[in-house]
UniProtKB/Swiss-Prot annotation:
The gene is zapD. This is Cell division protein ZapD. The lineage of its organism: Bacteria, Pseudomonadati, Pseudomonadota, Gammaproteobacteria, Vibrionales. Cell division factor that enhances FtsZ-ring assembly. Directly interacts with FtsZ and promotes bundling of FtsZ protofilaments, with a reduction in FtsZ GTPase activity. InterPro entries: ZapD, ZapD_C, ZapD_sf. One of its GO terms (biological process) is FtsZ-dependent cytokinesis.
Length: 246
């Protein structure tokens, strides 16, 4: 059975984390520059990340979240019934990630100070603004050897490695905290309580031809399935898999 997978954040912090994860993934995928116009996706992702960093103290939020995990793991040390080898491995990873995060400069600072990136950032956001007559410096860079472009991209992305490592760890732990269970949306509607949840994860069979519209917060949520072809609320029962991740 073919399914499409969907994630929905239940608080603003997690919403930002998922957006940053998506932008980092896009930037890494496009950094090979193996296809025409991949530079568009790469630079747009980088500039979107810079804009988020300018608005939110992401480093301090992530540091607090990783620290909470470290304290939780330490409370489980020597507790009977807990796999101590796995626990110590997770604690070591959390310790390393937290230390690297605390030593890192403010996220995106080196990107903002990069002469080339700063020279193209403003015009890049204009509709069609990446034409050679708008951004001659970008046009020159695009004609550099592929090895040079890949190396530049690697250096820019490496400056975000402490962020990427911390974010990947927190999201991995959050996702693994939830377990998929079979659910049924009666007449295309489902609602439930959630205790301090961060993310909803859904596996929805494609055969229904629907996508979810989700509203809610960390303690309660509702899912309404919408028919893709009509844009109207689905009136049939939808069987799907749901994980509520705290």
């Amino acid at each position: 059975m073919t399914t499409h997978n969907f994630e929905h954040p239940l608080n603003e912090k997690t919403r930002i984390y998922l957006r940053v994860e998506s932008l980092l993934r896009q930037a890494h995928t496009a950094a090979s520059f193996s296809e025409p116009h991949q530079h568009q996706l790469f630079f747009r992702s980088i500039f979107d990340l810079i804009e988020i960093f300018e608005q939110i103290q992401l480093k301090s939020e992530l540091a607090k979240d990783i620290e909470k995990q470290r304290l939780l793991y330490r409370s489980w040390l020597n507790v009977e019934g807990v796999d101590q080898a796995t626990l110590r491995s997770l604690l070591d990873e959390a310790d390393r990630t937290h230390a690297a995060l605390m030593q890192a400069p403010r996220f995106g600072q080196s990107l903002k100070e990069d002469r080339f990136l700063s020279s193209i950032r403003q015009r890049f956001s204009l509709p069609g603004g990446s034409c050679c007559f708008d951004l001659p410096a970008l046009h020159y860079w695009l004609n550099l050897p592929i090895e040079r472009k890949i190396e530049d991209a690697r250096q820019w992305l490496d400056s975000l490695k402490p962020l990427s490592d911390a974010l990947n760890l927190w999201l991995k732990l959050a996702r693994e905290a939830g377990h998929f269970r079979s659910q049924t949306a009666l007449n295309g509607f489902f609602q439930s309580d959630a205790e301090e949840a961060n993310i909803l994860r859904l596996h929805i069979p494609m055969e229904y031809g629907v996508y979810p519209m989700i509203s809610g917060h960390k303690n309660r949520f509702a899912i309404k399935f919408i028919n893709f072809e009509t844009g109207q609320a689905c009136s049939q029962d939808v069987h799907f898999e749901l994980a509520v991740c705290s």
